[in-house]
């Protein structure tokens, strides 16, 4: 298990601006339609985040991650990421809808940037072994990223199923509550195994705290040049 606290992430102000406009935020009404003013506001938001992560390697036969198995099961690196409490409190305190939209959009972009940093770090363990990491797939995310559903049938081209087709057929008699229990059991196991409390993450009933947190995994994939040998 590895732990990294208060690591640096790139801040993509233009991406936040583009997505905020796409989300319908009236930036002119709050004086954020100027690129310079918007960038300054995003910098203020970035100063309120405290990225922290724990992550670790899970082999193909790990019993706690059996729920994540695929038709061709692979080893996994699983990470638990939080952006801290302050940025969520900032969202709650904001009364203007346009600014609130910008904050939530910024948090989503910050989290994606942090995930990329984590991927680059975790890859340093995989590459010497002849592997590379897949794109992340999300077990939990707030705000919601491109994310898998607990039901494999709800996948799209940009996310990976939580269960393989065979498993989904075996479990098609389960209701939503029973399916949720699979994810809850996995979440509790990951909190314990990755010692998420060391970065301030906790379970409040079925809620993950701090609110702006995520749990995601990378598959270990054999590198193409190794496959061709």
List where the protein language model places each region.
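Catalytic cores of large soluble enzymes that bind and process phosphate-bearing ligands
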Residues: 30-37, 103-106, 110, 114, ...
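General structural feature for long, well-ordered alpha-helical segments within catalytic domains
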Residues: 37, 41-45, 114, 122, ...
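Short secondary-structure junctions and interdomain/linker hinges
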Residues: 45-56, 109, 113, 117, ...
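Short terminal or interdomain "cap/linker" segment that borders an active site or interface and mediates
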Residues: 129-229
């Amino acid at each position: 298990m590895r732990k990294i606290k208060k690591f640096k992430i790139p801040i993509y102000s233009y991406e936040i601006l583009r997505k905020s406009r796409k989300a319908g935020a009236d930036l002119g009404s709050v004086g954020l339609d100027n690129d310079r003013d918007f960038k300054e506001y995003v910098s203020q938001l970035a100063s309120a985040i405290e990225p922290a992560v724990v992550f670790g390697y899970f082999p193909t036969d790990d019993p706690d991650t059996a729920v994540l198995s695929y038709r061709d099961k692979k080893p996994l690196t699983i990470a638990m990421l939080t952006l801290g409490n302050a940025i969520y409190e900032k969202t709650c305190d904001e009364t203007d809808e346009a600014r609130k939209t910008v904050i939530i959009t910024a948090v989503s972009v910050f989290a994606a940037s942090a995930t990329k940093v984590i991927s680059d770090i975790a890859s340093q363990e995989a590459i010497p072994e002849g592997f590379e990491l897949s794109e992340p797939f999300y077990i939990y995310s707030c705000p919601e990223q491109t994310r898998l559903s607990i039901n494999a049938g709800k996948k799209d081209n940009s996310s990976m199923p939580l269960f393989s087709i065979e498993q989904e057929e075996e479990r098609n008699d389960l209701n939503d509550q029973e399916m949720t229990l699979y994810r809850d059991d996995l979440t509790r196991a990951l909190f314990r195994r990755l010692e998420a409390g060391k970065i301030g993450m906790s379970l409040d009933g079925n809620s993950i705290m701090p609110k702006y947190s995520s749990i995601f995994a990378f598959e270990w994939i054999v590198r193409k040049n190794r496959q061709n040998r």
